[in-house]
Amino acid sequence: VRRMLAELGFRSIDEAVGHAEVLDTDAGVAHWKSKGLDLSPIFAVPIDERGTRLPQRRRTRGQDHGLDHALDRTLIALAEGALEDAHPVRLDLPVRNVNRTVGTLLGSEVTRRYGAQGLPEGTIHVTLSGSAGQSIGAFLPPGITLDLVGDANDYVGKGLSGGRVIVRPPEDVLFLPEDNVIAGNTLLYGATSGEVYLRGRVGERFCARNSGALAVAEGVGDHACEYMTGGRVVVLGRTGRNMAAGMSGGIAYVLGLDPAKVNTAMVALQRPDPDDLVWLHDAVTRHARFTGSTLARSVLSDWPRRSAQFTKIMPTDYQKVLEATRMAKAEGRDVDSAIMEATRG
């Protein structure tokens, strides 16, 4: 690096900062896709209105992301009682699609004061009305519930960390929620814990890289549960193609699954066992209670028949680990050694 800097006339990387005039394209990586690209803005040297080169070669002003005016500032102020002494509060506010990452600053305040354990369940309950912008409920910690009456954009519950997000349409809608989209793509990306209940269909890559959260939706797009490593997912409707691609952990349950839509390279399709059905009944019951879902209620009202229509999507290696753990504990053997043996480690 020092030799290359010297060839350019610099003694250090610090001296090279801002000297765009020494940049050039590399003919060795020329590609037909790059034809027509105008790279002049990258090579531009700052000049004033008279064409004189400016001396500034570094950032001269910071970016304003508008955080001082974010909706969360209002939420933090209104939830001060809960933040001070964990006193339960209920808030009701409108939301617009320009309000992004709603709940994230509030959640960071909870974590700053109470640590990763957050607050007791239901301490802060926020009802929002309208269309939420991207990433509502991102990184939300325990103790906060965001109850959105309306719809949401992409990344709902991204990095969810113990909180609860509910998305449901207004009660007076004239359409069937289970046949319409309620939220966008890549929901619960990288979520570690918490719950999300969605009364309606959602977009693609639902629960990609989910590692511990519970999610219930009434239909999903392509690539659902992609690279999922933990948590549980319930889908009460149709799925898109390539479901469970790269899914190495966690469990998904789909009502009326089309097996052709599943990527079976790493998973097996099974019938839910009795323990699964007990858990499923509870999850669907919670979905009905939180969202008012008529679809969930219809499934519950005919549970003996409808429960038989669920398919369990189980990662094969994950099942080996669970079985090895169970056997090792029953026999008093070392669990880690049993897991290594079961997975050919």
Describe these PLM feature segments.
Residues 2-11, 17-20, 41-345:
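Long, distal/terminal scaffolding or interaction modules
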Residues 36-39:
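Juxtamembrane/interface motifs at transmembrane-helix termini
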